[in-house]
């Protein structure tokens, strides 16, 4: 049977909502640590509610944490804002006063930027074209500690960008630099903090983002052991580097994750279906379980019924051999988290029944 994960969030963080999701066929929860922390009371309360729901229904809790890893995200922002096509924006490391809206980005991205580059925001929701590099701004900072120490001067690079399409800029949004691979550390400082708490909170699996090769998985597995964790690693395929080293990733991962959001940015949308099929086929050939994620039921963020293409997508993922399916925003912030799980489970079950019929030679019956 296909294993179904739902992402926990404000739409489903209470025991009643989680019980409904479990009753509708959810097997485990995902916690997206790019938007929360195991150290926060709100996150711990959600885990407590999930455990209570599992205990009440007599099912084993499955808690997956999705690390921040080396992915590139926008910096923290007080308030989101909307960009219209053609609107200009300043791209820089820190959110300081500017005449135009600011997109704060990490050091790794600002160092890689050049005029003409295209920044893709939030799984391709919209993009920003880098027009030109602006005059850098020096900033003097005191190192602290010794009052006699000299100030250190930092030079902040700044770029002018222009919105290509309409979109919302928020803090902690995923950013992809088209045609370039820009990464931070395999395990971020925030990941280290979360991993110190993972065993205590009963984490049962870890999702590793932006895996580039099998060596990345080995590094994370060694790090997990240092925190007293010996749990499965779900390795997300999201880049060209991952595709180039797919064999080593399949060898080292416990589960391969076809993460279609950033993967589509890496290979282009028209190529995504074929890439998904090839990854699935390689995993099946190697007898490696795999998961399919991203926009499985995206319309159900606001609608109580999925679209025909969405249910067909789920069906085909199972036909291709997917062992796991997962939804993200559909359950974490969507209006109908329990219904999302119900449709995901029902369509997956129909696909499994079809496979059984096909094996028995009766699949042509309608």
Language model segments and positions:
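Non-catalytic helical/linker scaffolds that mediate oligomerization, partner binding
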Residues: 1-366
């Amino acid at each position: 049977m296909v294993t179904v994960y739902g992402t926990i969030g404000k739409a489903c963080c209470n025991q009643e909502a989680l019980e409904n999701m479990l009753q509708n066929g959810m097997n485990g929860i995902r916690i997206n640590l790019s938007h929360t922390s195991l150290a926060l009371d709100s996150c711990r309360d959600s885990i407590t509610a999930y455990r209570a729901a599992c205990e009440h229904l007599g099912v084993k809790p499955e808690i997956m944490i999705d690390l921040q890893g080396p992915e590139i995200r926008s910096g923290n922002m007080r308030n989101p804002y909307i960009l219209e096509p053609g609107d200009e924006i300043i791209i820089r490391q820190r959110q300081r006063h500017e005449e135009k809206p600011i997109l704060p980005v990490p050091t790794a991205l600002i160092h890689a930027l050049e005029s003409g580059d295209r920044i893709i925001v939030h799984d391709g929701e919209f993009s920003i074209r880098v027009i030109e590099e602006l005059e850098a701004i020096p900033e003097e900072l005191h190192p602290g500690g010794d009052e006699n120490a000299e100030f250190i001067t930092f030079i902040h690079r700044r770029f002018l960008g222009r919105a290509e399409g309409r979109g919302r800029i928020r803090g902690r949004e995923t950013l992809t630099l088209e045609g370039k691979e820009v990464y931070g550390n395999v395990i971020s400082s925030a990941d280290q903090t979360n991993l110190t708490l993972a065993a205590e909170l009963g984490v049962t699996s870890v999702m590793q983002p932006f895996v580039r090769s099998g060596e990345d998985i080995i590094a994370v597995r060694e790090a997990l052991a240092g925190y007293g964790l010996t749990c499965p690693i779900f390795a997300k395929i999201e880049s060209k580097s991952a595709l180039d080293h797919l064999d080593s990733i399949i060898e080292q991962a416990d589960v391969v994750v076809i993460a279609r959001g950033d993967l589509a940015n890496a290979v282009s949308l028209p190529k995504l279906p074929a890439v998904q099929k090839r990854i699935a086929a390689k995993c099946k050939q190697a007898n490696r379980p795999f998961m399919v994620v991203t926009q499985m039921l995206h319309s159900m963020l606001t609608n109580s019924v999925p679209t025909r293409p969405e249910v067909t997508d789920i069906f085909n993922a199972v036909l291709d051999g997917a062992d796991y399916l997962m939804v993200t925003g559909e359950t974490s912030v969507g209006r109908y988290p329990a219904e999302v799980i119900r449709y995901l489970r029902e369509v997956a079950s129909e696909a499994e029944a079809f496979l059984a019929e096909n094996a028995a030679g009766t699949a042509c019956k309608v």
